[in-house]
């Protein structure tokens, strides 16, 4: 048989397994690669031991370069899509991964043992998925071969659906597949058939993500300089969207509201007609003084993003071993919050009844910055003091 050709024409979707410890996330991940490989979709089977070997050495640095998170990355194909799949070895790795967005998820596969039903981490992972806005959750009830009573399975399924609804996922509509990952890996046709249903659920239920280039233009300003006789240039990496010569853009953040026209796009000292997501560019701006623009502002499609100062967030506080604080902090703590390219001072409010936050905790807190920053929900940030990173967070709700 010839080598299966890798087709790049299938849509690419990022997913991950979530759920309680020992409910079978890693075995499910291995099974997803095995059955896809057996079907001849050009996937490589990654056995349990390989998936479980996920270590910090192959872990992802998150985008804010705060933490190395132990994650295992595998890929597999279905008839319609190519999936990149992340599996984390430990609960703490999940918390860090989801808060920092190190491995983005367009959808999650919630693995629940049919023997135990939902457990504390099942809840916590659903809550985290909701907080960081994972758009959809597909449920895989694992170890169904160990439950003889069909009614017990119905009960577990009902419990999981209610839990999803509690955290504002459509619990009644979510696909729930009843399977056995280990038996599917061993080739038992009954359980392989259930994995075919799981692929189908992933393909039909998880919406195809909007590509970064199709989103409204945004560039965080890293540096600014003047070119005599030509004007002011702002440099940075385009976070999303496309910018073309002659288009209007808006400065946002630091109380700037100015709109301007892009008169030139430069990359590697060459002039381009346009720059797109991922490009490091210099944008020549009409009628803008060097003093009007500074690092920390963003250039964006007009009216696509607003400046804000106050928001709810989900935060992970680094442990001492991760280079974080050695001691707890209390309400009224005033660190710097690093957004995109700059530090801004702010104060924190802790949830009612919470006196202090210990290193290693993840906590919901309200933050108020001293100057407005271009912000939207799901924006990631770092918490720093004296140039040292002590926490990682995500904006969950904008207040002001």
From Swiss-Prot:
EC number: 3.6.5.3
Keyword entries, A-Z: Cytoplasm, Elongation factor, GTP-binding, Hydrolase, Magnesium, Metal-binding, Nucleotide-binding, Protein biosynthesis
Catalytic activity: GTP + H2O = GDP + phosphate + H(+)
Transmembrane segments: none
InterPro entries, sorted: EF-Tu_GTPase, EFTu-like_2, EFTU_2, P-loop_NTPase, Small_GTP-bd, T_Tr_GTP-bd_dom, Transl_B-barrel_sf, Transl_elong_EF1A/Init_IF2_C
Recorded superkingdom: Bacteria
G2 as annotated region, ranges: 66-70
Compartment(s) of residence: Cytoplasm
Disulfide linkage: none
Region (G4): 142-145
PROSITE patterns: G_TR_2 (PS51722)
Residue segments, region G5: 180-182
Annotated GO CC locations: cytosol
Binding site for Mg(2+): 26
Task of the protein: GTP hydrolase that promotes the GTP-dependent binding of aminoacyl-tRNA to the A-site of ribosomes during protein biosynthesis.
Alphabetized HAMAP family for the sequence: EF_Tu_B (MF_00118_B)
Protein name: Elongation factor Tu
Organism this protein belongs to: Gemmatimonas aurantiaca (strain DSM 14586 / JCM 11422 / NBRC 100505 / T-27)
Lineage start: Bacteria, Pseudomonadati, Gemmatimonadota, Gemmatimonadia, Gemmatimonadales
